[in-house]
Swiss-Prot record:
InterPro entries: Ppm1/Ppm2/Tcmp, SAM-dependent_MTases_sf, SAM_mthyl_Trfase_ML2640-like. S-adenosyl-L-methionine binds at D133, D162, L163. It is an enzyme of class 2 (transferase). The lineage of its organism: Bacteria, Bacillati, Actinomycetota, Actinomycetes, Mycobacteriales. It comes from Mycobacteroides abscessus (strain ATCC 19977 / DSM 44196 / CCUG 20993 / CIP 104536 / JCM 13569 / NCTC 13031 / TMC 1543 / L948) (Mycobacterium abscessus). This is Putative S-adenosyl-L-methionine-dependent methyltransferase MAB_3886c. Belongs to the UPF0677 family. GO terms for molecular function: methyltransferase activity. Its EC number is 2.1.1.-.
Amino acid sequence: MARRDGDSWEITESVGTTALGVASARDAETRSPNPLISDPYAGHFLAAAGDGAWNAYRFDGEPPAALVEAEPRLVERIDAMRSYVACRTKFFDDFFGDASTSGIRQAVILASGLDARAWRLDWPRDAVLFELDLPRVLAFKAETLDKQGATPRIRHVPVAVDLRDDWPAALRAGGFDVGRPAAWIAEGLLPYLPPAAQDLLFERIDTLSAPGSRIAVENFGEDFFNPETLARQRERGQAFRRVAEEMQGQDIPDVADLWYLEERTDAGEFLAGRGWRVTSETAVALLGRHGRDIPADLPDATPNSAFLFAQKAD
């Protein structure tokens, strides 16, 4: 289903299903023999959501033969995406750890989804974490974690707001201090924003950020939105999605239908133009650094993305 202005969703609908898919990958990585990250809460979200395509990374044993017939290299592709999510998660985990070590005591997660960093990471006692997402997404997460008796390891402030609306006002109302440096992350977010909304997002971050603030971004450049690349990916995935839908008895969204595919300003260039010092690492390099190289003949098994770090000049 294509996106529309002002659309919203339950966790098992539309963009919400992608948060469950990422939780599935984090859960699979956590249960693997040599996990790069640990997320003991991801499995609880999946259990609360029930059966669905979002459990794709959690096959116990071999995947169904019909799925393998539709996508012969299914296992390799699943492993590649699990590794991508694991390395991405570690990148942002480490970002927050480094920011805390540097003395930053405000953290902000934009479109937090089923992120459980408030519960699973170590934080300074005087730090605060703001999580921004739609009300129904935050409510699902809170209800699920409350049932597990989970307690945040940081002062945790959920901010129920749509990032297409006036979220800075909601953030300040939650106690965000524009006079103190902050650490921001935008993980798995940008393709789900229209180009103008992406620019406005970073304009607002710049306005809200005191000198010394930091931001980490999963960035998607021109190659990611290339129409020919997307067409090939969709064609390859059609047969797999059709078989999976027949097996599960429910529609499986084409994730590209949830993206805004228009040309947009590069996030790194945008921030650099406003005086932020920007460095970048490609996803290929990030995965390689953690020993998770993707097979050379499966270059499209993971997103063609890069991971940005930027700091606002003092």
